Amino acid sequence: MKKYLLTVLALFSVLATANDDFKASVTLGYGTNDSIYRGKENKSIPIFESISYKNVYLKGTEIGTKFIDTDRFDTTLFIEFLDGYSIKGSKMDVGYRTINKRKYQQAIGLKADIGIDEISKNLTFSPYFSVGHRGTQAGASLSYLYMPAENIIISPSIGTKYLSKKYTDYYFGIDRDELGGNITNEYNPDGAFEFGAGLYGEYYFTKHISALAYVNMSRYSSEVRKSPITEDRIITNVGAGLKYTF
């Protein structure tokens, strides 16, 4: 998979030099992510690609197209190939390994970016909705772009999203055949909310090379936190990396 992505990036880098409509970047970083489940935190050294041609883009595991694009408003139709969560029983803490495997879903959705120029030209409101065979999500975020210098970007954000009952029941519910160890009761949660805040920063050494860092924190409503297989805590995702823009 990584060889395939690098080959695609190499091809797009050649095309980008010949066509201004092509844009591409690749980021190599290191990140840690608290698990919502009763298991170990995730540590990874990901390669993150971002490729676009006119109104079509590939960003990480998401592909999409903008069909409305104005100075203050744009709308995007997208497909997320790794939506949701993935966990095996063998990766859970001792006493919680009787659960069935939870898998990612593929989701299709709509999202928009709306500039709130009445308050600030750097303030953006971003609602979105997505649906997959394991449930739906709907939410919105508010982000601010601050540039203390031409080569420095700082962007704080806050957001919330709603997870449907079908979604929360699949990822956080407990069926009878999963009982065992510390899991003593079935659990059938209703729809839930997630509240989050984040901070992103990027420093450009040159036009093509930059360093970035980010921290994201989220908190789930009680429907998720009361599940026997989840941790009742703030979920933190921290990372940093180097980015090359073609």
Question: Model features per residue range: what roles?
Answer:
Residues 26-32, 51, 60-62, 77-83, ...:
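Transmembrane beta-barrel strands of outer-membrane/channel proteins
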Residues 22, 41-47, 52, 71, ...:
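Residues that define the transmembrane beta-barrel architecture of outer-membrane proteins
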Residues 55-58, 73, 118-125, 150-154, ...:
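Repeated loop/turn-to-beta-strand initiation elements of outer-membrane beta-barrel proteins
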Residues 19-65, 166:
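Short glycine/proline- and aromatic-enriched beta-strand/turn motifs that initiate or cap beta-hairpins
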Residues 33-36, 95-98, 126-129, 182-187, ...:
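Extracellular loop and loop/strand-boundary signature of outer-membrane beta-barrel proteins
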Residues 52-54, 68, 113-119, 145-147, ...:
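Structural signature of outer-membrane beta-barrel channels/translocons
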Residues 135-139, 143-224, 229-232, 244-246:
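Outer-membrane beta-barrel transmembrane domain signature
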Residues 1-23, 227-229:
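Cleavable N-terminal export/targeting peptides
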